[in-house]
Every structure is written in structure tokens, then in C-alpha cells.
């Protein structure tokens, strides 16, 4: 039996104890997702306040999401190295303090730097929390507890556009980040009380080269895209950064295929069904993730709508998501995965085409239904 499983603090628990841990993780997930999406409706105001183009201001969102994606693989290693308690408390503290830093930023560079720091905390909060729930819960509890954690993924994006629109309209955009402070303090207090234990085992050697190559490649790609989105794009530098990103990412992939303990085990992509699922889902999520980011920019910068009206209409994207969730299991059982996925992909493509054809004269009801 490993040291952790012998520790009474990490043995499977029943009743309110494990539920409270799951609710804590759900709260962290809610805070992370809310922060990732609430900023979208404020992009035009942020760009005006910091005197940059709306497209360039999108880096505030992109830098956060890319950093989270890059650092999530590190969370497991950090947990084994430093323990659940230390990592989760540090993650919540970093996220909360970085939120304060975002609110205090006086320049675009400062804001992006604080968003990256925010993402460092966000990348560790939820994965570590899920690991705690899996380790402490009985097998009979796992599905029910994971449902607690999944719901914030549905609720936060639903309310974020409208909440962001209201805050941006009636207060300064900096309040978008200040609302994280009380949430973070409560999360820290709960984590301090609920989370205990130490690393279950000695972690494998960290794949430092994999971290450097993947982080460098994605950073170059993100910065190059930012330059293209600027009102005065620097095409030569953007092209150079694009080339650098390709070289670094290809080198990183080759490296991770050769080492025994890579940052991300790309050898799993040799399984055809898994590889096809990853390619298909990645392309699908590119579209799904772009729509709620691009629509507020379209509504506010092109149509001239208010942040509240813009956020309220984007809200329908996520309401549709919630509305279909209860029926997904029935659809899969009745028609099978293949038919449902093909139909969903076709509907998503038609929706994206419809969004591209929107004009200021399009009826609001039609936009909401779309």
C-alpha cells in the first residue's frame, strides 16, 4: 500500500467529507471557466482603455487559454513532487493574486503578463482537484461526484457573457478580475481545511526539454497570431515567429516520441481510433471556441451593440448546449456515436456559415435561434 493510501486523510471517504471536496473542486472549476470567458464581452472596452485594436486585445483571452493548455500536463508531476495540499493551495493563491494584478494593470503588456500568471494557477487547480476526488472516493461514488464537477463547465460559460456585459456597462472592466478575490479567499479557506496528504510516489524525471520546446513553440505561435491581428500587422516578424513555432513544435513532438517519460505521451496517437477522435474533436472545438469569442467582437465593434445586448445573445450559444445535454445519452443509444457525431458536425458547420452571414439588420430572434 502506498504512503498516501495508508494516510487516513486520503482514504476513500463517505458522506459530506468527499462531497465537500468535490464541491471545492467544482468551485475552482467554475472560477477558472468564468474567468476564461467573462473577459470576452469586455474586449472592445479593454482595447479602447489600453489603446490597442480589438483583435490584438484578444491576446488577453488567448494567452490565458494557451498557458492553461501547456501547463496542465505539468500538474500531475507537480502533485507527485510537492503533494496535493501544497499544489492546490499554491494554485488558488496564484490565481487569486494574479486576478488582483490583472485589475491593477496599467498597460497591455502588464495585463497579458498577469493573465499568463493567472493561467499558471488555473492550470493546476482543476486537474489536481480531480486527482484528489479520484483517489479519495469509492468507485461507487466517482460518477456522481464527477457530475458535481462537470456542471460548472456548463453553467460558467452560460452566465459569463451576460455578467461580463453588465459589469463592463455599469462599472470598469477591471471589476471582471476583482470578483475573483472573494471566490479565491473562500476557496483557499476551504482547501486549507479539507485537503491533506503527501505525494503518493516519487515522480519520474521532469521532461524539461519537452516543456521548453512545447512552451516556446506555442508562445511563438500565439505572439505571431497577435501581430497579425494588430491594426498595423508586422508581417515579417509574424512570419518568422510562425516558422520558429513550427520548428520548435516539430522538434518537441520528435523528442517526446523518443523519451521514456515525455511531457505528453504522443505514442497514444498511434491508436487509430484515438488519433481520429483527437483530430476531429480538435477541429470541432476550434469552431466551438471561436464562436463565443468572435460574436461579441462582431456585435460590439461592427454592429455597435452594447456589451449587455452582446453578452445576452452569446448566452444563447451556451443555453443550447445545456438544453441538449440531457438528451445526449438517449441520442447515442438510439442512433449510435457515428450518426450523432456526423449530424452534430454538419449542424455546427451550418451554424458557423450562418454566423458569417449575420448583419446588423438580422432579426435578434434569428440570431438567438442560430
What is the predicted function of each stretch?
Residues 1-17:
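Intrinsic disorder in cytosolic terminal tails and internal cytosolic loops
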Residues 18-43, 50-69, 74-76, 83-88, ...:
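12-transmembrane solute porter fold
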Residues 46-47, 78-79, 163-171, 225, ...:
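Interfacial helix-cap and linker-helix signal at transmembrane-aqueous boundaries
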Residues 72-209:
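Helix-loop-helix hairpins in multi-pass membrane proteins, especially solute transporters
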Residues 94-104, 183-190, 217, 225, ...:
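Transmembrane-helix signature of multi-pass solute transporters
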Residues 105-106, 138, 194-197, 229-230, ...:
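Short helix-capping/hinge motifs at transmembrane helix termini and TM-loop junctions
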Residues 169-280, 287:
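Hydrophobic transmembrane-helix bundles of small-molecule transporters
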Amino acid at each position: 500500500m502506498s504512503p498516501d493510501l495508508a494516510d487516513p486523510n486520503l482514504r476513500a471517504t463517505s458522506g459530506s467529507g468527499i462531497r465537500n471536496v468535490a464541491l471545492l473542486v467544482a468551485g475552482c472549476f467554475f472560477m477558472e471557466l468564468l474567468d476564461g470567458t467573462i473577459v470576452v464581452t469586455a474586449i472592445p472596452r479593454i482595447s479602447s482603455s489600453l489603446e490597442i485594436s480589438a483583435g490584438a486585445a484578444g491576446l488577453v483571452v488567448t494567452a490565458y487559454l494557451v498557458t492553461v493548455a501547456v501547463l496542465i500536463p505539468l500538474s500531475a508531476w507537480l502533485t507527485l513532487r510537492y503533494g496535493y495540499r501544497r499544489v492546490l493551495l499554491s494554485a488558488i493563491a496564484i490565481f487569486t493574486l494574479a486576478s488582483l494584478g490583472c485589475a491593477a494593470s496599467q498597460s497591455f503588456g502588464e495585463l497579458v503578463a498577469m493573465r499568463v500568471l493567472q493561467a499558471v494557477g488555473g492550470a493546476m487547480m482543476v486537474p489536481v482537484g480531480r486527482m484528489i476526488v479520484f483517489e479519495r472516493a469509492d468507485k461507487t461514488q466517482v460518477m456522481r461526484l464527477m457530475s458535481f464537477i462537470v456542471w460548472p463547465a456548463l453553467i460558467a460559460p452560460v452566465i459569463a457573457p451576460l455578467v461580463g456585459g453588465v459589469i463592463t456597462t455599469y462599472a470598469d472592466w477591471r471589476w471582471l478580475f476583482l470578483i475573483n478575490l472573494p471566490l479565491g479567499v473562500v476557496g483557499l479557506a476551504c482547501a486549507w481545511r479539507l485537503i491533506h496528504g503527501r505525494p503518493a510516489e516519487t515522480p519520474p524525471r521532469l521532461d524539461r526539454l519537452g516543456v521548453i520546446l512545447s512552451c516556446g513553440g506555442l508562445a511563438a505561435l500565439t505572439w505571431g497570431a497577435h501581430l497579425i491581428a494588430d491594426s498595423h500587422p508586422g508581417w515579417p516578424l509574424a512570419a518568422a515567429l510562425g516558422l520558429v513555432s513550427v520548428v520548435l513544435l516539430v522538434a518537441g513532438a520528435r523528442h517526446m516520441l523518443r523519451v521514456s517519460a515525455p511531457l505528453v505521451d504522443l505514442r497514444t496517437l498511434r491508436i487509430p481510433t484515438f488519433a481520429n477522435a483527437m483530430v476531429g474533436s480538435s477541429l470541432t472545438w476550434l469552431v466551438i471556441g471561436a464562436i463565443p469569442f468572435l460574436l461579441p467582437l462582431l456585435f460590439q465593434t461592427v454592429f455597435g451593440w452594447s456589451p449587455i445586448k452582446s453578452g445576452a445573445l452569446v448566452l444563447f450559444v451556451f443555453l443550447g448546449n445545456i438544453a441538449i445535454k440531457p438528451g445526449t445519452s438517449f441520442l447515442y443509444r438510439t442512433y449510435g456515436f457515428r450518426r450523432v457525431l456526423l449530424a452534430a458536425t454538419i449542424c455546427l458547420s451550418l451554424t458557423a456559415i450562418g454566423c458569417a452571414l449575420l448583419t446588423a439588420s438580422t432579426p435578434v430572434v434569428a440570431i438567438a435561434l442560430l
